[in-house]
C-alpha cells in the first residue's frame, strides 16, 4: 500500500483528513498517516482552536522532514485564502485572472520550491470551508435554520462555483458561514458537515479539489 504524509493547516483539516479522506483513499490502496497540523491557536473566546500559517519558512520547515521519510508521498491541505505574504509567487497570484489557473500556477511554484519528486502540493480554493457550499441543503439541515440553503445557493450562483467564492474579508466562505450561523464552530461543525456531504458531492461541485483527489487516488496504482 502506498503511504501518504499530509501537512494540514489546522484542526478542522486534520479531522477531515482522518475521518473522511483517509477511509476514502484506503479504498484506492493509499494509506494516509496521521496528518501533521501546521499550526493551531486556542481561541480566547473558548470556541476551540484555529489553524493558520504565519510565514513561508514555517511551511517549508514543517514539510522538509516529511520529504525525507523514505518512499512516502507528501501532500498539503492549506488554504489559498490567507496564505502568508511571503509565500512564493503569491503577489502575482493575487492579481486579476482565473482563480483556478492562478492557484494551479501557485501550486507549481510550491512544488518547484520543495523540489521533491513525491510532493503533491494542494491549496484549497479559496479555503477549506468552500466545500460546505457544495450542499447547501445539508448545511441548513445540520443547523436547523430556515433560509440558510437559499443564501448559500445565492453565494454560489453569484461566484459561479463554491471554489470561486472570493478573498474578501467579509465574503470568503468561512466569513459567510459565520454571518449566517453566529455559533458556527469550524473544528466541529465543519468536519461533521464534510462527513455528511461526502466526498462524491464535494468533488462534483469543486473541480480543483477533484483534480487533487484524482491524483491521490492514482497513487494506489503507482510503485512505491
Language-model segment annotations:
Residues 1, 14-46, 56-224:
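C-terminal accessory helical subdomains adjacent to catalytic cores in phosphodiester-
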Residues 6-15:
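Catalytic nucleophile-elbow at a beta strand-turn-alpha helix junction centered on a G-D-S/GDSL motif
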Residues 50-54:
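Short, flexible loop segments at the rims of nucleotide/cofactor-binding pockets, characterized by
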